[in-house]
Amino acid sequence: MYQHILLAVPLQRWEEYSPHALAARDAAVAIAKGSGAQLSVLSVYDYDNVSDPGLSAEMAARYREDLMLRTDSEMETKMKAFLAGIQGHDLPITPLLKTGEPRKMILTMIELLHPDLLVIGSHSKRSVLDVILGGTAAYLLRHAPCSVIMVQPKGEKSPPSTTE
């Protein structure tokens, strides 16, 4: 069946994990357990821009460096906590944290890792951010060179199609 599953989840934007990320995680774990596949868990994030005209170039550079270190540390903590929810399943799991634009980085990681399945969560269209991320999910469904499963949390209705 499947040998390598890539689970892509947006951990940066949530204090607590979204129902979409948790549903995708549960589905990826179930499929990996059923097929004996390796599971890679990818979260792509970015750094907030520093754009304060009152800061000197040196201060802005120091602030940005500090922001990057804090963001990296925060993302490592979020990934560990997210993976703690699947400990004890006796699965080979590889956590991956990358910076960049999600759709591009996910496709890059697919090219590097060669998974035979990508698992992503669907996103409801409640905010501009959800529309953007929903666009990422739709893009991956069209462009990923492997099978893709898009998972919705239980009880959530499918959003209207945006590709018609």
Where are these regions (language model features)?
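Acidic, proline/glycine-rich short linear motifs
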Residues: L42-E74, K157-E164
